Amino acid sequence: RLIVALDVPNILQGLELAGRLGKAVSFYKIGLGMLTGGGLALANELKAEHGKRIFLDMKLFDIGATVEAAVRGLAQYDLDLLTVHGDPQVVRAAAEGKAGTNLKIMAVTILTSLDRADLDANLIKPGDLREITLERAARALEAGADGVIASPQEAQRSALCRKPRAS
């Protein structure tokens, strides 16, 4: 499934791009950088007026109560996907916040821009980056994430971490 990133500075440019793409695209990603440019209004318009699906890439990370409240508020926009950092306590809070909605919580395991030196500087445990990513993916899924965001390098191996389907 194709998800097009609306990495533009404001709602007008986002609507213009979505208009040019028309029916060829049914799913859009709106990131943190677009938030102050009318990102939530853009999400609302694309969803309500044009029937598009929305992936809000916020990578939320805070104390549980704050994440839960933020997700509860964002769920009112009838979003399809929302990213949070994959720490289990963050994922659990997000799952609580989305309760009773169709919003899917996607966990970000490790930012793709980070390398081993960055992880060391941030006191992230030693080890192979791919193995840590898989471990974090498994923990996020156990904590209630609906899915995991991974780099192409980890995506194939992350498929091993899928939640078991209820029989």
Give residue spans per PLM region.
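Short beta-strand/loop segments at the ligand-binding rim of alpha/beta enzyme cores
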Residues: R1, K47-M58, T101-A107, K163-S167
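Conserved, mostly hydrophobic/aromatic
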Residues: V4, Y28, K59, L82, ...
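Conserved alpha/beta-domain cores
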Residues: L6-H50, G64-A70, L134, P152, ...
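Short phosphate-binding/catalytic loops that engage adenosine nucleotides
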Residues: S26, G51-K52, L79, A145
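Conserved anion-binding
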Residues: D62, T66-A166
